[in-house]
Every structure is written in C-alpha cells, then in structure tokens.
C-alpha cells in the first residue's frame, strides 16, 4: 500500500518516530467539496452528502444512476468509483485525498530498533477458560506464592495486572482480568498485549462452551497456548479425558507427539504452580520476546477509571521503551504529563520498563481502555493527536458499514481469507452450514470458520468478530435489540438466517464481489399483545389481537415497545384457541410464539413483514 506524506514524515523523525511540527499540517482534516472545478473527497458519501457538497439536485443524481441500471435512495452510499462516475457526468474533475487519522498515525509510527538495542522482556500472560474451572483461583495462588502475607493483604489498588517471579527470580506479567472477553476487547482495538494464553480446564469437568470460545479467541490471535489441567486434587479428576477432548482443537501434549505444553496441577493445593511458571518462561525464551528499553515508551491501557484526588487514571502495560514520570502521553482522546505512577502494591515509581504494569495519572480527560499509549516530546503534537481521536469518534456513525468495506476489500483483492462466525439453534444446524461452507469454491479466496457454537449471539462473539474481521451469522435464532446495538456500535456485520442454502449463497456472492440484493420491507400485519403465557417447552406465548392486515406463520417480525424495536425474529407458531393455524386475519385473536424472544410484555406491538427484492446490485 502506498504511504502518504504524513507517514513518511513520522517515520523520518530522528528520535523514535516522534511527529515533527511540519507533520501537523498533514493531520488537519481534508475538506470535502468543490474547489476550482475539482471535487475533493476522502471516501464514500451518501447521495444526500454528495448533493450538498456539489449543489447538484438529489433527483438528478438518482436519475443518473437509475439510467445506468442502479436504483438508489437519498441515503444510499456512493462508492469511490460511483463518486468518480458522478463527477465525470456532472462536469467536475475529481481527486481523492487520504486523510491521516489517529489510528493510522498511532499504528504506523515505525520504530526501527536494531538488534543490538533489544533486550529480553518478561512474557505477558492472560489466563482463560470456562467459568468455575479455577481461573481466578489460579491467579490468586500464583500471586500468593510471590508476595508476603502482609503485601498480599495490603494491596491498595487493583491495576489489572501484576508481576511475579519464579524460583530463579525471573519475571512474568499476568493480566488479572481473566476471561476471553477482555482479551478480545483489547484485540478488537488493535492491541497485541498478551504474549501467551494459559488455558485452564478442570480435570473433573472437561471441555465446556467457554473453553471452546477461549480456544477460538486465542487461535484467532495466533497466541501460543499452555494448557493447565486444574483440580487434579479431586478424586474424580480425569486428565486423559481432557487431553482427548483437546485433541480435536489441535492442542496435543508433547508426550502424545504434539507441540502444546500441558501442566497438571491444582490451584487449591499449589500443585504444578512452579512447573507452570517455568514453562511460561521457557516458552517466552523460545518465542524471544524483546524490547528496546531506552526508547520513548509505548504500550496499552488495560483499564481506565476516575480516582478521587487524581482524576482520570489509566492502568497500562508498557510494551516498548521506559515510561517515566513527566512523560507526555497520548491515550485515545486523552493526553497529559505522567503525574503519578504506582505498581500493583501501591508503591510509588519513577519509571516502568517493558512488560511492567503500572497505574498512571495526569490525563486531561478520561482515556479509553484497550487503546495504545505513546509518549511524545511535544505537548502540542500530543494534543493534536488526541483531538484527532475525538473527531473520528464523532464521525464514526457516518463511516462505511463493515459489509461494504469488506466487499471493497474483496474487489480490490486485499482479502484472501474471509473469517466466519456461526451461532445456531442446534448442532445439526452448525454441521449443515459447515458442510455448505466447505462446498463453496471461489478462486483465490478461502473461507475460515473461526468459531461455531450453539446458542444466542453474545457480546463476546461480537468482539471476536470485530477483532478478526469476521462476518457473524445467527442460524434460526432471533436477535435482541441490545445485541444489535452492540454490533452496530462496534461496526460488526451481523445477520440472522433461517435458510442455510440462502446463507451459503450469500457468502458465495460476497466472495465473488457482489453486493447484497436491495430489499424492501413490506408490512403484512400488526398485532397487539393482550395476555402472556409461559410453556416449559415452547417458552413465551403472546395472546394477541390482530389490529391490521394478517399474520402468517413463518413471517419475519419486529417487536415494538413504546415505538422502539425490542426484538427482531420470526413467528414460529400461530394458534387460534388451541388449534395451530397458518394465518390469522384482522380482528381475530391468536397465540403467537416468536423464535428466541424472551422479553415480551402486555401492550407490545408485533409487526409482521416480508422482504421483497427491489434490485440486485454489483460492485
């Protein structure tokens, strides 16, 4: 990819890639509009936005594309190619400018450390696994074996991570926010913090849902895994069964001819703890984790909060360089000089070296967890970068959807592997879609199912999709509005499908670079919820009266409460009295079951609708 001038200037600065004053001008927003007969733009715009920037009537723009076989609305997004086509048609020259953003400045500052400047740093470890398998107990036991009772009881603040030493006095950093949600949230923001994942599995319980999720998340991040089989003190412990279960995830112990480190032990008794620490350090040496200790510092925020007396504070892990008191730090929308620095025991520090977790204060506003921090020489430059972050947060709602961006990338051959995540109502549905995906064959692009499980889509699934750039599909299960809102906020493409062949066809069309068909929602009928029943096998049954139109079994539907959408799904069952029916007309009472909907109340409105294809599109 061709780098713009601002990147070159950032890279050429003498000390650690700090930003020169001349680069400030490159950081200013490129203004979209017509200048001297040239339409300057930064990226895709809606028809309405293009019209307002060029003073061309919306109707004329829509007419132009309609005559060329493309039906658009005022809110349709014009691609870069379509904008160029419109400019030519309406008599403008055009020029696309690349805007320098907070993300690409932070991500692309190049640190060219020669090998002689690098020194080993402690490995950074996250513990993951199923709930109740002993993640927290393991962390506590490791912590207790490395501090005195007085120190352990006297911790003054929780900073999200801590360091321990093994019997050879070698250091390991543990992130003590166990769970794959925190792990993936960091990765979704581009943060490569964790070096090694310790996967905890209970010897008396085996592989569970969250175990599988944790494996998917770690493998998706290409993070090495060490398996700790916990609860070996239990009389029902069966480590061989656990090992057999893990084989299907390509986690095979070295003793069985594999490459994965397995440690047997007990967080309760302390069995295997020293062996685990030694193996973490051994793997760290093999992987060769290094950093330049003498450089300006950078790293990641694992937690942020407000402290009485200190204001906004951030719990950070240093990944490069040495962070010092008085350093000017940028962290997301916040910047400031490091005013105080403490370790996990509340000890005041003057500096922090690579892999060291510390709590720092001195920010002007609240930072953002998961973002990268960087030290700058010039406070004005720091303020400029922080302000850039704020501006982009405001503009986020106007950005391209993930789906359209994905298709642009596929068209431009920037994506060679498309990641997929499936959640389904049953294992049978999962097996069916897996088989369907295996049969999809598009030249030069491959499909990778990075996670598939039975159950509703969770926030964890959304964060994994964001972190891995995956498409997320729900099979035969509706979505709550909360989940949809989270997906929208994170920019994740999320779809519900009730027909596996159609889903497979859509995935194939995406790979071929086709746009989704343009659909129009046609309201079929509307019903008001008057009563509620609960059936142990069916779930919630809504007693309704059809207010308008007709309701059909199998209709897509939306559940409204106070004019807000609460749930979207499908009508699975209709009953008149106790008789199953396929259709209910206006004025009649009926019992309605909405697939996957658990939140329904008297007074809610159910709107049944159908989707009709208006027009197919192509990139």
From Swiss-Prot:
Q: Where is the signal peptide?
A: none
Where primarily located?
cytoplasm
Region annotation (G4) ranges: 230-233
Q: Where is this region: G5?
A: 266-268
The GO biological-process annotations, alphabetized, read as: translational initiation
The record's annotation in Pfam families points to: EF-G_D2, GTP_EFTU, IF-2
**In which domain of life is the source organism classified?**
Bacteria
GO MF entry, a single one: GTPase activity
Residue numbers spanned by region G2: 154-158
Q: Which GO terms describe its cellular component?
A: cytoplasm; cytosol
Task: Tell me the ranges covered by the tr-type G domain, including all copies.
Answer: 120-289
Which Gene3D superfamilies does the UniProt record give?
P-loop containing nucleotide triphosphate hydrolases, Translation factors, Translation initiation factor IF- 2, domain 3
Q: What residues does GTP bind to?
A: 129-136, 176-180, 230-233
Listed A to Z, the keywords are:
Cytoplasm, GTP-binding, Initiation factor, Nucleotide-binding, Protein biosynthesis
Task: Tell me the segments the record calls region G3.
Answer: 176-179
> Could you tell me where this protein is found in the cell?
Cytoplasm
Stored HAMAP family: IF_2_B (MF_00100_B)
Q: What does this protein do?
A: One of the essential components for the initiation of protein synthesis. Protects formylmethionyl-tRNA from spontaneous hydrolysis and promotes its binding to the 30S ribosomal subunits. Also involved in the hydrolysis of GTP during the formation of the 70S ribosomal complex.
What is the name of the protein in this document?
A: Translation initiation factor IF-2
> What's the source species for this entry?
Mycoplasma genitalium (strain ATCC 33530 / DSM 19775 / NCTC 10195 / G37)
């Amino acid at each position: 990819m061709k780098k713009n001038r601002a990147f070159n200037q950032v890279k050429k600065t003498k000390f650690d890639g700090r930003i020169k004053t001349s680069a400030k001008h490159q950081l200013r927003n490129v203004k979209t509009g017509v200048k001297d007969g040239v339409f300057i733009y930064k990226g895709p715009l809606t028809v309405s936005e293009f019209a307002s920037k060029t003073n061309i009537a919306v109707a004329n723009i829509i007419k132009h594309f309609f005559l060329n076989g493309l039906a658009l609305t005022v809110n349709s997004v014009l691609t870069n190619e379509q904008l160029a086509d419109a400019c030519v048609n309406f008599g403008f020259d055009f020029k696309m400018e690349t805007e320098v953003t907070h993300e690409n400045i932070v991500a692309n500052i190049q640190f060219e450390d020669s090998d002689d400047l690098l020194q080993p740093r402690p490995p950074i470890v996250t513990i993951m696994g199923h709930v109740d398998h002993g993640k927290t107990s393991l962390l506590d036991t490791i912590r207790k074996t490395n501090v005195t009772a007085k120190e352990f009881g006297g911790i003054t603040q929780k900073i999200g991570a801590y360091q321990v030493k093994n019997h050879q006095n070698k250091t390991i950093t543990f992130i003590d926010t166990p769970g794959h949600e925190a792990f993936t949230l960091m990765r979704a923001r581009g943060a490569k913090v964790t070096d090694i994942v310790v996967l905890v599995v209970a010897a008396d319980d085996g592989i569970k849902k969250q175990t599988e999720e944790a494996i998917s998340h770690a493998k998706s991040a290409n993070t090495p895994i060490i398996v700790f089989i916990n609860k070996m003190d239990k009389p029902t412990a069966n480590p061989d069964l656990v090992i057999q279960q893990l084989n299907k995830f390509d986690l095979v112990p070295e003793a069985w001819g594999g490459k994965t480190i397995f440690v047997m032990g007990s967080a309760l008794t302390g069995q295997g703890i020293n062996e685990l620490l030694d193996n973490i350090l051994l793997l760290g040496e093999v992987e060769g984790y290094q950093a330049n200790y003498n450089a300006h510092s950078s790293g990641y925020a694992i937690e942020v909060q407000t402290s009485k007396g200190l204001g906004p504070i951030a719990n950070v892990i240093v990944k490069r360089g040495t962070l010092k008191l008085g350093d000017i730090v940028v962290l997301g929308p916040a910047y400031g000089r490091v005013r105080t620095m403490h370790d996990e025991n509340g000890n005041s520090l003057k500096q922090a070296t690579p892999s060291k977790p510390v709590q720092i204060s001195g920010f002007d506003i609240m930072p953002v967890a998961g973002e990268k921090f960087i030290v700058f020489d010039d406070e004005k430059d720091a303020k400029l970068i922080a302000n850039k972050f704020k501006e982009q947060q405001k503009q986020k709602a106007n950005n391209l959807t993930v789906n359209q961006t994905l298709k642009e990338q596929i068209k431009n051959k920037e994506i060679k592997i498309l990641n997929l995540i499936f959640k389904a109502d049953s294992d049978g549905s999962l097996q069916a879609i897996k088989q369907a995906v295996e049969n999809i064959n598009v030249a030069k692009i491959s499909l990778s199912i990075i996670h598939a499980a039975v159950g509703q889509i969770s926030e964890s699934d959304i964060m994994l999709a964001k972190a891995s750039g995956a498409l997320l599909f729900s099979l035969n299960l509706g979505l709550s509005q909360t989940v949809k809102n989270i997906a929208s906020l994170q920019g994740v493409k999320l779809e519900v499908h009730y027909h596996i062949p159609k889903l497979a066809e859509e995935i194939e069309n995406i790979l071929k670079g086709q746009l989704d068909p343009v659909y129009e929602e046609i309201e079929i009928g509307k019903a008001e919820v008057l009563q509620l029943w609960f059936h142990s096998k069916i779930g919630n049954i809504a007693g309704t009266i059809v207010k308008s139109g007709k309701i059909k079994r199998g209709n897509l539907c939306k559940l409204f409460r106070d004019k807000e959408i609460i749930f979207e799904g499908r009508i699975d069952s209709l009953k008149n009295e106790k008789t199953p029916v396929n259709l209910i007309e206006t004025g009649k009472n009926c019992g309605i079951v909405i697939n996957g909907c658990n939140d329904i109340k008297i007074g809610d409105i159910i709107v049944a609708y159908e989707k009709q294809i208006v027009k197919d599109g192509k990139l």
